Amino acid sequence: MFTGSIVALVTPMDDKGNVCRASLKKLIDYHVASGTSAIVSVGTTGESATLSHDEHGDVVLLTLELADGRIPIIAGTGANATAEGVCLTKRFENSGVVGCLTVTPYYNRPTQEGLYQHFKTIAENTELPQMLYNVPSRTGTDLLPETVGRLAKIKNIIGIKEAIGNLSRVSQIQQLVNDDFVLVSGDDATSLDFMQLGGHGVISVTANIAAREMVELCALARQGNFAQARLLNQRLMHLHQKLFVEPNPIPVKWAAKRLGLIATDTLRLPMTPLTDAGCSVVEQALKDAALL
């Protein structure tokens, strides 16, 4: 459940900015039918930063309800205050989630010791499996391999989503952890190379709109069929890249609406709709990927 193509799911909203139950159900059904390994609910792509604390929990619980056991759900539980991270994680204890994805604290930029103590404290306050999430471009803090190695010794810290974009991190981390520690990419554009170096999959933005393709890509990579995987990835590369023509999740929400997967591309301020220029770029990327 922590390997293969895991979707970083968008949080669909109606025209008024309220969570849209019907669109969320449609998305979940799409991923069940496509064979997606698991859903991350309310991560970065799910607009965790603009949902209230209560809404955050409510969306995860609604996702669990609508999934109804058909696909594993991983809860996004990142916070830049350790106590809040503990509180959010505890809300999902015994809820049915299979684990939590916990981003490094953002904005306050803790030291490596602070990062270690943050994740250690959260892990010690739950039985839920914890997956670390390193994305320095958003948080301003880099979780270094040595710190990951220390954290990997904690029994319920089971892996990391590594989105630094530096492929050397795969081997650096592998040298410091046991073989059962899960390494997944957080960058669609480099995810195939990440898997070829020994990674186990990807937590994917692209999978929101190309679920079957990302499932196939990961399956080919896990089988060692990198020649076929590269052919597929070449078709998707423009899409991987152009889904970030404006800040995530602006482009992918527009694309999901364009493909009829969600009813609107509504976002919460300060996120604003995709510009006309961005729409043209993403439209072409969808065509290049043979999705239109």
Curated annotation (Swiss-Prot):
It comes from the Bacteria. Pfam families: DHDPS. It catalyses: L-aspartate 4-semialdehyde + pyruvate = (2S,4S)-4-hydroxy-2,3,4,5-tetrahydrodipicolinate + H2O + H(+). SUPFAM superfamilies: Aldolase. The keyword Lyase applies. GO terms for biological process: diaminopimelate biosynthetic process; lysine biosynthetic process via diaminopimelate. GO terms for molecular function: 4-hydroxy-tetrahydrodipicolinate synthase activity. It is found in: Cytoplasm. SMART domains: DHDPS. Its EC number is 4.3.3.7. Keywords: Amino-acid biosynthesis, Cytoplasm, Diaminopimelate biosynthesis, Lyase, Lysine biosynthesis, Schiff base. Pathway: Amino-acid biosynthesis; L-lysine biosynthesis via DAP pathway; (S)-tetrahydrodipicolinate from L-aspartate: step 3/4. The record marks T44, Y107 as: Part of a proton relay during catalysis. One of its GO terms (cellular component) is cytosol. Belongs to the DapA family. Homotetramer; dimer of dimers. NCBIfam families: dapA (TIGR00674). Catalyzes the condensation of (S)-aspartate-beta-semialdehyde [(S)-ASA] and pyruvate to 4-hydroxy-tetrahydrodipicolinate (HTPA). This is 4-hydroxy-tetrahydrodipicolinate synthase. It comes from Erwinia tasmaniensis (strain DSM 17950 / CFBP 7177 / CIP 109463 / NCPPB 4357 / Et1/99). The lineage of its organism: Bacteria, Pseudomonadati, Pseudomonadota, Gammaproteobacteria, Enterobacterales. The gene is dapA.
